[in-house]
C-alpha cells in the first residue's frame, strides 16, 4: 500500500511536465519583454535622447530582486529544515514550489498588472512581484509541511497563485490600499490560506508520526541559516517595489529597526516564559522575524524609527506567546496542525501589520508628507479620499485578504483530499524516505521503521 500510494513515478512527471508545457505555450502566446528589456524599444528611447542606460529600472531594482530571490530559495527553504527527518523535502519541495510558482504568477499577475495590447510585458519589477507571490505559497507550505506530497503542493501552488493574483488586484487596485511589503497580501493571505488547508486535511492519527515532528541539534542549526538570511534581507523584501528615493530609503530604515527591536523582545520573552529561564530555538528561529512582517504595510509610511521599534517589539511578543500558548490550542481544540507555526510568524504579525498601517494612514497629513503624499497615499494627495477614509479602506483590505484565504483554503483543502495525489499516510508524515532516495542503507531502514510505526531514534 505504501509503495503504491506514494509512488511518484507517474504522478510527478505527469503534473510537472504537463504544467510546464502549458506554461511555455502561454508564455509564447502572451509574454513579451517590456520597453526597458526590449532591444528595439530601449534603443529607440536612447536614440531619441529621452533616457540613458543608467536610468534603466534594472539598475534600481536588481539589487532588491537578488535579496528577495535569496529569501525565497534559501531563507524559506532552510527555515523549514528543523524537522529531523525531513530536510531533503523541506529545501527541495520549497525549490519545486518556487520554480513553478514564479512562472505561473508571472502570467497571473501579468494579466492584472502588465497586460497591454493583448500581451503581458515583463521586466525586473514583474520578477520581484512573481517572487512575492511565490512567498505567499511558501508560507502556506509551512502550515502543511511534512503532511503533503509534491503533487499536492504543485496543485496547491497552481490554485493559490491564481487566487493571490485576484486578491492582490482587489486590494491594491479596487480597494486602493497600500501594502508594499505584503503584510496583508502575502503574509496574512498565505498564513491563513495554509492554516485552512491544514484544517481540511486534518489527520486524526498524526500521533503515529509525532516522534519525527521534532528537531535535533543539527537540524535546528540548519534552520537558523534560513533565519539569518531572511533577517538580513527583509529590508529589501519590504522596499523592493516601493517608489525610488525617500520611500524606498524609509522602508529599509523602518524594517531594519523593527527587526532589531523584535529580536530583543523575542530573546527576552523566550527566556521569561521558560520555567528555567532557558531560550527556545523555535522562538529564535521564527519570532525574531515577525518584526519584518509587522511593518510590511506601514514600512513606506511615516511610521518613524521609534514607531517601527514599537511595532517590532509587539510583533516579537505576540509571536513568542503564540508559539508558547496558541499553537497547542489550535492543534487540540481547532484541529489545525500548523507544522511551522505560520500563524505566529506570518498570521498574527500580518494582522498586526495591517492594523498598524491603518492607524498610521489615519494620521497622514500634508504637513507630515508634503509632496511625498503623492507616492504614499495618492488618493489623499489628489483629494479623492480623506486620511480617515484611507484608514478604513486599509481595514477593508485586511478583511478581503482573510476572506480570500478562508474561502480559497477551504476549496483547495477539499481538492487536495482527493485520493490521487500520493499523499503520505498518517504513519509516513515528516519522513524523507517516503519520497526520496536517502543515501546509504539509511533510507530503507527508516522506511521500514515508518511502516512498522516505530521511533527511528530508538533504532540501532
UniProtKB/Swiss-Prot annotation:
Indicate the principal place this protein occupies in or around the cell.
membrane
Residues on Cytoplasmic side: 1-10, 84-87, 147-150, 203-220, 274-283, 327-347, 416-460
Please give the Pfam families that the UniProt record associates with this protein.
Ammonium_transp
Cite the InterPro entries for this sequence: Ammonium/urea_transptr, NH4_transpt_AmtB-like_dom, RhesusRHD
Its domain of life reads: Eukaryota
Tell whether Transmembrane helix is among the UniProt keywords: yes
Q: Which ranges does the record mark as transmembrane?
A: 11-31, 63-83, 88-108, 126-146, 151-171, 180-202, 221-241, 253-273, 284-304, 306-326, 348-368, 395-415
Q: Which GO terms describe its biological process?
A: ammonium homeostasis; ammonium transmembrane transport
The record's gene field reads: rhbg-a
Residues with glycosylation annotation: 48
GO molecular function ontology, one term from the record: ammonium channel activity
Q: Which family does it belong to?
A: Belongs to the ammonium transporter (TC 2.A.49) family. Rh subfamily.
Q: Which residues lie on this side of the membrane: Extracellular?
A: 32-62, 109-125, 172-179, 242-252, 305, 369-394
Membrane topology qualifier: Multi-pass membrane protein
Tell me the keywords, alphabetical order: Ammonia transport, Cell membrane, Cytoplasmic vesicle, Glycoprotein, Membrane, Transmembrane, Transmembrane helix, Transport
What is this protein's function?
Answer: Functions as a specific ammonium transporter.
GO CC terms for this protein?
A: basolateral plasma membrane; cytoplasmic vesicle membrane; plasma membrane
How is this protein named in the record?
Ammonium transporter Rh type B-A
